[in-house]
């Protein structure tokens, strides 16, 4: 059964030494598709280059809340144009991150709203990054009627109760390596509650590698460890988890379930 890594950062310098060899090997080993996600202006450019080079890699274009300090109208015009790239399947990752004091919340909120408007205009799903900002994220999304746009809550980290707000908006939940951590009680409670039909699997590579590789560089094939834990929680097989989350990823990003002949 093929793996769909719905959120990775293979443009990261952690892959500079072996990127081509690794990506080709992952594809041979059953990773059918990867969405490489932009976070800054420079990473969006690299993401488009990767998607252009590898048929099984798709792009998401957007500016991470922690990088919104670099945005102005000129650079945002470039983002708007880049989101029209034929292999861009989503606007992201966008959202709010209050873990660090900069950029200030007002700046993050402004560009989050602008990027949500862009997703609506282009009819593309959103990849939402939210950290230590649960209430403001939901409030802004509801104000913008984000449920009409759709998308995924990347690396979901909030409570089971908060999950209900996103379920009501019809959003998917990105689940990755953290699910395998022994201390991830809150996420495990949420993942048990969220229907499998609303879950997609992701790595956030090179970050957040699952057990038994915690602390190492994350790679797409490690998703199988996450699938094993999720299967155990749901009382089904790994194959069922991979099949359903593959279909969910295709629905999320508007891709056909069957691989195109160029992707094989």
Predicted feature descriptions by range:
Residues 1-264:
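Mid-domain alpha/beta scaffold segments of enzyme catalytic cores
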């Amino acid at each position: 059964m093929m793996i769909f890594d719905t959120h990775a950062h293979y443009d990261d310098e952690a892959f500079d030494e072996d990127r081509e060899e690794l990506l080709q090997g992952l594809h041979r080993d059953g990773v059918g598709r990867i969405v490489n996600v932009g976070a800054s202006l420079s990473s969006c450019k690299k993401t488009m280059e990767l998607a252009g080079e590898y048929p099984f890699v798709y792009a998401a274009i957007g500016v991470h809340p922690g990088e919104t300090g670099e945005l102005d109208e000129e650079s945002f015009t470039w983002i708007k144009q880049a989101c029209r790239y034929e292999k861009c399947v989503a606007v992201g990752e966008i959202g709010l991150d209050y873990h660090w004091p900069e950029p200030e919340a007002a700046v993050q909120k402004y560009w989050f709203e602008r990027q949500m408007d862009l997703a609506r205009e282009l009819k593309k799903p959103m990849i939402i990054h939210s950290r230590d900002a649960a209430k403001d994220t939901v409030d802004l999304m509801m104000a913008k009627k984000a449920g009409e746009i759709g998308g995924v809550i990347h690396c979901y980290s909030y409570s089971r109760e908060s999950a209900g707000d996103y379920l009501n908006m019809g959003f998917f939940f990105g689940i990755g390596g953290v699910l395998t951590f022994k201390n991830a009680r809150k996420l495990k409670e949420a993942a048990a509650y969220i229907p499998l039909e609303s879950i997609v699997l992701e790595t956030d590579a090179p970050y957040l590698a699952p057990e038994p590789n915690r602390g190492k560089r994350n790679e797409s094939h490690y998703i199988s460890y996450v699938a094993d834990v999720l299967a155990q929680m749901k009382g089904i097989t790994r194959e069922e988890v991979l099949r359903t989350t593959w279909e969910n990823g295709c629905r999320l990003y508007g891709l056909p379930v069957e691989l195109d002949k160029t992707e094989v």
